[in-house]
């Protein structure tokens, strides 16, 4: 299936309630579980609280899609700065990539799919936070830098993207 065929496919009425990604020429249905969903909501909630005090952009949840490097992704959460996009798009998949993506690993994520997504996000300048509930750590992927692993005793900071944002990793996993 081509990306154009995918774009038509997701707009069919029977697909209206499905979360679909286009990765490596394949249609992947996003399937999560309650644990991953709760962690993603909690993680996004911390970013949202920060944004209430620092009105520098907006967050999208697990149904906000993005066009990334010719593919279509639906991250668990994403932050888009006002300098990149002033308000959320009404398109199913925004053509403007986010500044930051939050992914929470769940049993349906294959290591290959996640690697492809991270590489493609990085290729368009997106920072990626991958939360691993089993290992209780967050991997931070920043364009042009080595991966940083922040464990349960560490502090995750927003760097240049979310200046002044900091959260104890243990608080992310304390559900």
Q: What are the roles of these predicted feature ranges?
A:
Residues 1-175:
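Gly/Pro/Ser/Thr-rich low-complexity, intrinsically disordered segments predominantly at protein N-termini
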């Amino acid at each position: 299936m081509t990306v154009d065929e995918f774009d038509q496919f997701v707009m069919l009425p029977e697909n209206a309630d499905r979360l679909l990604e286009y990765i490596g020429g394949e249609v992947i249905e996003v399937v999560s579980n309650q644990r991953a969903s709760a962690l993603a909501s909690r993680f996004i909630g911390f970013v949202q609280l920060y944004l209430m005090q620092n009105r520098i952009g907006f967050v999208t949840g697990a149904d906000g899609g993005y066009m990334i490097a010719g593919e279509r992704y639906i991250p668990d959460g994403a932050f888009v700065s006002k300098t990149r996009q002033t308000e959320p798009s009404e398109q199913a998949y925004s053509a403007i990539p986010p500044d930051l993506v939050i992914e929470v690993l769940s049993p349906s994520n294959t290591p290959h799919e996640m690697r492809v997504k991270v590489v493609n996000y990085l290729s368009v300048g997106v920072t990626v936070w991958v939360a691993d509930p089993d290992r209780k750590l967050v991997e931070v992927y920043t364009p042009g830098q080595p991966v940083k692993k922040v464990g349960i005793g560490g502090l995750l900071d927003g760097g240049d993207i979310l200046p002044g944002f900091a959260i104890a990793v243990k608080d992310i996993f304390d559900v």
